[in-house]
Amino acid sequence: MTFDVNFRAGEYLVEAGKWEVPHLMEHVLLGANELIPRSRDFQAELEKNGAYSNANTSVYDITYEIECADFEWDRVLGLLLVAITKPLFLDEEFAAEFGNVQEEMAARSNNHFRRLSLEMRRALGLIAKTDSERLELMANVTVDDVRQHYIRTHFAPNMRFVIAGNLPASRRASINKLLEAIDLPKKGRRLALPIERPKRLNRPVYVANDTVENLYFYIDTFIKRRLSEAETDALSLINTILTETLYSKIFGTARERGLVYGMNSGLSYTRSASNWWFGAQVSDKNARALLKITVDELHKVFSGDITDDEIKVTKQYALGRFQRSAQTVGGTAAGYAGRYFFDGEIENYYRVPERIRAITKRQIVEVARAMFADNIWGFGTLGNCGEVFAEQLREDIASLWST
């Protein structure tokens, strides 16, 4: 069984100087509580039959996750609910987790893709701070800040959950009873997502790092609205065609020419905008060639240069990937949680194959063009290539927004 419990309680809800409050709260909450008043003892009881627990904090949310064997679902769920509803937030455990979070932030700061992504996000007008900034701000946070943030955010209407596993009627009834009786305040409503308005960057984001031999880059483009379900499906399919396999149009071509080891792209959303991004780590000498392939293949999409066979083959790939994702309880839970925790929409999982089959070439071309039509975009690099070369790379891709 998998239990994911989510609260709209992320960093956007605290003042900038107190940025690390939600993250520290998440670390301390799955610890000492009224039932078991010591963190190590609580974790020992929770995990004694092999259960796994974790939690994560983002700009928007905090999610608590537990996965356990089927035979102990009720015991483990009970412990999770006690941790969420009866935390003690002890001074000594806060001090210990303060040190652990410092170590976590220091480790994260070595992830160059993450560093560039955060610098890009902030430059584009979205809510973000780098890990090094977060480390500096940690000293502003007290255990009282954590307690107050818990009170402001952990109330029943602000909670969402996804539970996956063997769920016969009797078990569903028991779970419903537990959740309906949860000992959290019942007044209020789900906290709203922040309003973020991405903006066009007129120069590249350049993060100098002389220790990096290759350069890391990201391309971000935005449309000033949320995509429809059909548009999202179509954009996901062309994203697969372009970068997600070793035979894809951009990544596959670049690999065939020996230009890059790996490349990624994907979709993301804010409350009122949609984002399509591309990123890779590549040597300076191959960077312009890789970006030329990217630009050329995207222009082909804009002009409708996609064959029916390419679409058919990619649909088959997408169908298989979907089925594979639903083969575990964790995969099934993740399939529901992404959208539900973000905007409250419960997707009909059984319709996904039908949606994939319904994607048309016209939809693909239209949504790909639309993602570049608002001329809101940015380009960023991390490495030691220099600002002049970074600007040259930006100029190499600028034609994508003049179609």
Where do the language-model regions lie?
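Charge-rich, well-structured scaffold segments of protease-associated domains
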Residues: 32, 40-190, 196-197, 206, ...
